[in-house]
A protein has these predicted regions:
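Active-site/ligand-binding-proximal alpha/beta "capping" segment
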Residues: 185-235
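Amphipathic alpha-helical repeat scaffolds
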Residues: 34, 117-124, 238-243
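RNA substrate-binding interface of SAM-dependent RNA methyltransferases
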Residues: 43, 98-191
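Short acidic-hydrophobic, aromatic-tinged amphipathic segments that line or gate anion-handling sites
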Residues: 3-6, 70-75, 163-170
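Structured adenosyl-cofactor binding patch, chiefly the S-adenosyl-L-methionine
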Residues: 93, 131-132, 146, 151-159, ...
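Short beta->alpha connector loops at strand-helix junctions that form conserved
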Residues: 74-75, 114, 140-141, 163, ...
Length: 255
């Protein structure tokens, strides 16, 4: 296994480039950091390409070689140069970008994000959707890149298990789903009490809007139901990920 010592090495430069969206799109790969996340990516069938590891992670690096990766050892300083965090976890690997699920193959229970920009919120909602029993994530224009390190770190492996779909026109996508039998439920401050909403049926999509502006007017028009969580204390609103989690679990409780 080759030992890399220079930050100018092509492998290091290529992996460092995966920290931004343009670099991922150009390379067709994304970065996964840490043993837990790397093992989950492998378990979910993603294709590994390159791995960079400190000496104490060499056993996993050899496993990645067995899975078809080109593995290298490197000092911590180079892991820090590649990592998206201040404290790298000793090993990182590049994987082929997974293809988004086509909207025509949409599953029954979907959470849709309309312009949710915060990577932590996107990843947390993804993870919660997986835990609650939702089957897919639909990302609209303006959302954080689902394959960014920050999103995947917050998703904690759910980003590999729960398929995602993407659309540049959320209202159009929701209209298509509605036409095919999905009930569109949108979280909105103008909506009715969430706990009094009618049963959405088997196929439904829960829409969560951006942290600052909520859902767009066009998305609002595409919804079958507008709902909001009651604020019984002094707070005016909840974090997008918290609100999404409450609604997802309540919707699944009734299944």
């Amino acid at each position: 296994m080759e030992h890399i010592t220079s930050a100018k090495n092509p492998v290091v430069k290529a992996m460092r480039g995966l920290r931004d969206h343009k670099g991922r799109e150009t390379a067709g790969r994304f970065l996964v950091e840490g043993e837990v996340m790397i093992r989950e990516a492998l378990k979910c069938g993603l294709t590994v390409r390159d791995a960079l590891a400190e000496e104490d992670c060499i056993a996993l690096a050899k496993e990645l070689e067995g899975a078809g990766a080109r593995a290298y050892t490197a000092p911590r300083s180079l892991l820090e140069a590649v990592s998206d965090t201040r404290t790298p976890q000793g090993i990182c690997a590049s994987f082929d970008l997974p293809a988004p699920l086509p909207l025509r193959d949409a599953p029954a229970r979907i959470v849709a994000l309309d312009g949710v920009q915060d990577p932590g919120n996107v990843g947390t909602i993804w993870r919660t959707a997986d835990a609650a029993g939702f089957q897919g994530l639909l990302l609209g224009a303006g959302c954080a890149d689902p394959l960014s390190p920050k999103v995947q770190r917050s998703a904690m492996g759910s980003g590999f298990r729960l398929p995602f779909m993407q659309t540049g026109d959320m209202p159009k996508a929701l209209a298509q789903l509605h036409k095919r039998g999905w009930t569109v439920i949108a979280s909105d401050l103008r909506g009715a009490d969430f706990y009094s909403h009618p049963d959405p049926g088997v196929n439904f999509v829960l829409v969560i809007g951006s942290e600052a502006r909520g859902i767009s007017d066009a998305t609002r028009q595409a919804a079958d139901m507008l709902v909001k969580l009651p604020m019984r204390g002094g707070a005016e609103s909840l974090n997008a990920a918290v609100a999404a989690g409450i609604m997802m679990y309540e919707l699944m409780r009734k299944r």
